[in-house]
């Protein structure tokens, strides 16, 4: 029987099928952080239960960590307590822990791949929505709640109904200035934030085949924003080249055998999907969001649609525009902005900083812009320095901060003030997401760079 990539990975991890119920599903890799894990560990302790496979769980501090002066004690009491709890729990149960200052520390969905923990054909969970990032490697990866974190810690399994399957094909050649973030935002704009509900998505077509692993991670990261359970891309030579030699990746003969198996992880020619979407790469231009969900995105040269042109309630749509201070039929180009955020598990990798630096090189940060440039990990931070990118950023008037989730969800001090506009390379533009009253415009690193040096929304293609 022909199978999709998703079927092959899912079916190989089902421990038991429950009639008219969810599957008992084995988890290969489990990532935890300081926010969603403390209560799960309290549950274990209250039941007198141990962590079944501590070597399959990895802990990193990221969500509410400061991005300056990380060598000093964390000032916020709640954050300090959560960070200490993560360290204590990891030590007690024998779990690898990369806290503040550790050379491997960083955002969970950045450090997993860069250390070779994320592998093709694996099942991966974390108490975080954007766990779908790891699907870029041909893994099944999705976010879970705190009670499920406890379940995985104690049993290494989870109860999960099998989602339906959707394939999104993007073929053709992307225009200059259009990158993975634009592709993802375009897809979400087409499907809406609920169009993927109930599905696990496979991204296919030559656009994804030609993407780097960093680009694929950006796309899979945003799968959850169309309502999907997750997204994945079949592993290929690009995947293998990225993983070879990384710390937790197989070595020697084990590597050879692993690659041999990974090459089988692709959808069979006559496999059937429950839904399919076809997109022409040439239709995608640099994207920008204008509302309060990631599906409210348009090409930078387009006008904001009228309420009658979009799905959903007219009252809700107008409320969203009012929150953003925009009107129907507004042109986005030329709108002044106040903040720029480069970072997050969506766009905090070395490729994103290279793209940003390419635009700002030889230019200066606009005086009206406050910029937060936050690498996704210490490894990325080191690469920025080694490649001379830091020199370019410094010359242009930018300051590099220390790794963490930062302004993506503003759990630390990196908060956008009320009423201010932030061009952000993160993944969510909900009301107050980056601080109470903040106004978020989701964009690619290139778009963010263009805004940072001009002080307003600018078509980045004009700066090449």
Swiss-Prot record:
Pathway recorded for this protein: Amino-acid biosynthesis; L-leucine biosynthesis; L-leucine from 3-methyl-2-oxobutanoate: step 2/4
The UniProt record lists the keyword Lyase: yes
Cofactor, free-text remark: Binds 1 [4Fe-4S] cluster per subunit.
SS bond partners: none
GO BP terms: L-leucine biosynthetic process
InterPro entries in the record: 3-IsopropMal_deHydase_lsu (IPR004430), Acnase/IPM_dHydase_lsu_aba_1/3 (IPR015931), Acoase/IPM_deHydtase_lsu_aba (IPR001030), Aconitase_4Fe-4S_BS (IPR018136), Aconitase_4Fe-4S_dom (IPR036008), IPM_dehydratase_rel_enz (IPR050067), IPMI_cat (IPR033941)
Cofactor(s) this protein cannot do without: [4Fe-4S] cluster
GO MF term (any one): 3-isopropylmalate dehydratase activity
Reaction(s) catalysed by this chain's protein: (2R,3S)-3-isopropylmalate = (2S)-2-isopropylmalate
Task performed by this protein: Catalyzes the isomerization between 2-isopropylmalate and 3-isopropylmalate, via the formation of 2-isopropylmaleate.
Family: Belongs to the aconitase/IPM isomerase family. LeuC type 1 subfamily.
Protein name stated in the entry: 3-isopropylmalate dehydratase large subunit
Natural source organism: Flavobacterium johnsoniae (strain ATCC 17061 / DSM 2064 / JCM 8514 / BCRC 14874 / CCUG 350202 / NBRC 14942 / NCIMB 11054 / UW101)
Lineage: Bacteria, Pseudomonadati, Bacteroidota, Flavobacteriia, Flavobacteriales
């Amino acid at each position: 029987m022909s199978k999709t990539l998703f079927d092959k990975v899912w079916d190989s991890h089902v421990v038991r099928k429950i009639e008219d119920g969810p599957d008992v599903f084995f988890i290969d890799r489990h990532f935890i952080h300081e926010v969603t894990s403390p209560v799960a560990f309290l549950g274990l302790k209250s039941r007198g239960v141990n962590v079944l496979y501590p070597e399959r769980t990895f802990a990193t501090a990221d969500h509410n960590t400061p991005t300056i002066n990380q060598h000093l004690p964390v000032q916020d009491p709640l954050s300090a307590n959560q960070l200490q709890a993560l360290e204590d729990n990891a030590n007690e149960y024998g779990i690898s822990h990369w806290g503040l200052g550790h050379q491997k520390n960083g955002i969970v969905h950045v450090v997993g791949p860069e250390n070779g923990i994320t592998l093709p054909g694996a099942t991966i969970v974390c108490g975080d929505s954007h766990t779908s990032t790891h699907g870029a490697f041909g893994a099944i990866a999705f976010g879970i709640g705190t009670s499920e974190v406890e379940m995985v810690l104690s049993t290494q399994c989870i109860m999960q109904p099998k989602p339906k399957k959707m394939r999104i094909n993007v073929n053709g050649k992307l225009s200059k200035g259009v990158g993975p973030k634009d592709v993802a935002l375009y897809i979400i704009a087409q499907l809406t934030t609920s169009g993927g509900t109930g599905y696990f998505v496979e991204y296919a077509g030559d656009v994804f085949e030609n993407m780097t692993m960093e680009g694929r991670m950006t796309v899979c990261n945003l799968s959850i924003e169309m309502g999907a359970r997750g997204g994945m891309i079949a592993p290929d030579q690009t995947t293998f080249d990225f993983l070879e030699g990384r710390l937790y990746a197989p070595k020697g003969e084990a590597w050879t055998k692993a690659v041999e198996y990974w090459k089988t992880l692709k959808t069979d020619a006559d496999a059937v999907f429950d839904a399919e979407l076809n997109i022409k790469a040439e239709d995608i231009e640099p994207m920008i969001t204008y509302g309060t969900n990631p599906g409210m995105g348009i090409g930078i040269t387009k006008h904001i649609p009228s309420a009658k042109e979009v799905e959903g309630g007219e009252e809700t749509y107008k409320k969203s525009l009012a929150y953003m201070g925009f009107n129907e039929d507004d042109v986005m180009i030329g709108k002044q902005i106040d903040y720029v955020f480069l970072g997050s598990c969506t766009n905090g990798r070395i490729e994103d900083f290279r793209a940003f630096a390419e635009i700002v090189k030889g230019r200066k940060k606009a005086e009206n812009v406050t910029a937060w440039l936050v690498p996704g990990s210490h490894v990325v931070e080191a690469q920025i320095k080694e490649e001379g990118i830091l020199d370019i950023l410094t010359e242009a008037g930018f300051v590099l901060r220390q790794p963490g989730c930062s302004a993506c969800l503003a759990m630390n001090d990196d908060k956008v003030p009320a009423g201010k506009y932030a061009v952000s390379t993160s993944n969510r533009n909900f009301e107050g997401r980056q601080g109470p009253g903040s106004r978020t415009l989701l964009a690619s690193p290139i778009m963010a760079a263009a805004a940072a040096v001009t002080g307003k929304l600018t078509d980045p293609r004009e700066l090449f």
